[in-house]
Amino acid sequence: MEFYQLKITRKGTKPPVWRRCLVPADTDFAKLAAMLEDILEYADTENYEFEFFQKKLRLQNLEAQTAEATKGSYEYAEAKGRQIAELLDTEAWFTFRVKGMELPEYRTDIEKKITDEEKAGTPEILKETRSAEDDFWTADMQTKNTELEKKYGALGIADIVAKKV
């Protein structure tokens, strides 16, 4: 199975606060949003946005956005149904944000694409760095990976697909 290795860095933090993770390559941006929300410990929302600055492209759940949310110099497109490989194979990074909430934005570097026939198709946090006073991420990496395995493993993925996509 193929995966993308992503380094997700919270914007505006010094020293940087980040998580390196693997996400399955055979998914669309709507499912990737759900995975990133879980990795970043956000509540599930439909108001996510992927911004590819170099392409002047923003991917969203267009049904959940207001008219003002799609104005400006960017092209806006539907995240659901658009495969992540289409952009993650060619771009170096993107910004992930949840709109309408006071939550941090994340620069997401696309580090590499890997193949691992042994690994199940679930997202996984590989490494993280956070500051001592950071109270935004409450779960440690091992606990978070256990939650991700339960939610996105073979038994949990049907529930996710039924609810989110």
PLM region spans:
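Short linear regulatory motifs enriched in tryptophan with gly/pro/ser
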Residues: 1-165
